[in-house]
Amino acid sequence: MKRIAVICAYPKHNPGMYSVDLGLGSIVNTLEKVKVTRFNIQDNYSIKSDLYKLKYNLLYDAAQLENFDKIIIWGDFLLWLLYGKHEILSKQRKNLTYDQIFEKWSNLIFLKNRPDLQKKVIIYGTTLYGINSEQLSNNDYLSMLSELCDNAQSISFRDVFSANFISQISQNKNVSYRVDCAFHFNTDKILKNIQDSPYLCYSFGRSGCDAKLEEFAKEVANSMNLNAVNLNWLDKSGLPGLINKISVIKGSSGLITDIYHCGITGMRESVPVIGIGMGASTISSTLSDKKKEVFFTQSFANQNYIYAESILNPENKTNLIADTCLKLSNSHAHEIINSFIKKKTESDKDSLIFEILN
């Protein structure tokens, strides 16, 4: 039996993170004699629905990983300094200092000074797209990032920027760009939502102008003679809620969203997707809009990405609605996008399986 430890982000209430972690489950469930144990560094946590379940163990000491054959660092921003500084600190006990949090992050995510463990590591689907020289001026961070990546078995990032950045920081030659982990989530068990009439679904919550974006989505739907359905992607309905949202997306005629993993879900389900984000957004946090723009561009779908500023400009409104309707109706373009994504997802899955088993 091959034992696999998977280090994940803390997923509570985040449907995108559930999709990410179910993606690995869809892969390893096809493998014989492979046992997966999920860890995060914040808390013991479990959640289930009628179709799926996820269980996370608390990782509090790197020694817990010693008896595993492989260690997968899976998804999200786990290796980015801003994640360690803000995400983890915000979810820890208030009596811990930042220095204590940083040390914990260093030891449990980067496996600092543990080359024996680092050599077992497969880095998959994480991102460093916002890394910069100011962050790299933290010598401790640069040192432990280089050390982990030099020793890792393989490094696969979810965006082209991260794959390029790490190749300049690490001597490891086994570096690649692969799809977001959520693309590996096999949703065949989830049935399409069947409604009386065709509909366009939407969900917003990241770009800071939800009401205006909702108004825009409804006008697009009306122009296409479709009902408009709000997914409420970011509500706290947990794993059962995610399953329902996927069902609604599967049955829709299209999706308009400013939420990264909501857009990925639409593309995975072969639904036409319009992504929205602030063109003036800077890369200042894990929720910055630029990650959506990068994703749509590297997926040959940049024509389906709209700057929110354009929607907020009333002079653009009529033409933008008409143009968005045309983009949602361009079946040939969507077939090309879906074809590339499906081929790459399958190829990346095969590569990951090989790395797990060898």
Predicted regions: what they are:
Residues 1-358:
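Active-site anion-handling motifs in enzyme catalytic cores
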